[in-house]
Each structure stands twice: as structure tokens, then as C-alpha cells.
Amino acid sequence: MEIDLAELRRVVEILLNDLEQQGYRTVRLDDDYYWEIPKEDLYSPYAAPKDLAMGQLTHDWERLQEILHGSSSPLAYGLVWLSSLLRAIG
């Protein structure tokens, strides 16, 4: 599969705009810790994951805020942190 980044950006904007139109200015996440499946296991549906790890939403958000405020350089792994937050919101 190949995804156009402009289309991906647009669909994220549409979804976040919809939340704002529903009156949300913030979202509350009551859970903090989650199971993290290693990438090599995540997309292997015919085998059970071997080494689960713990992820933390507050940690992910802190790393993203560092990117937002310029104290950390953008890196592709930021999308992993973002995905954990979007999953929790959804």
C-alpha cells in the first residue's frame, strides 16, 4: 500500500476538526499505560507476539511536545508516539 502524505494530513485534519465541531477543545485520557507489540510481531497475524512491552501515553505526549516546542528534532518515531495517542482517543 502507498499512502499520499497530503491525503493523510487532510484526513487527520478532517477528523480533528470534527471533534472540535462537536465541542471538544481537549480530550481526557484516563488510562496511561498500554501494551506495546514490537513492530516485527505487530504485522505477523499468524504468530502470537513474543515480547510485549509497556508503553506510556504521558511519555509519548511529552516526547511530542518536545518536538512541538522545538526542544527535540522531528523524527519518524514520533509517528509511533502519535499513533498511541490517536488510538487512545479513538
Predicted regions and their residues:
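Short, charged/polar micro-motifs that form catalytic or ligand-binding hotspots
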Residues: 1-2, 47, 68, 72
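Short, charged, amphipathic alpha-helical segments
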Residues: 29-35, 76-80
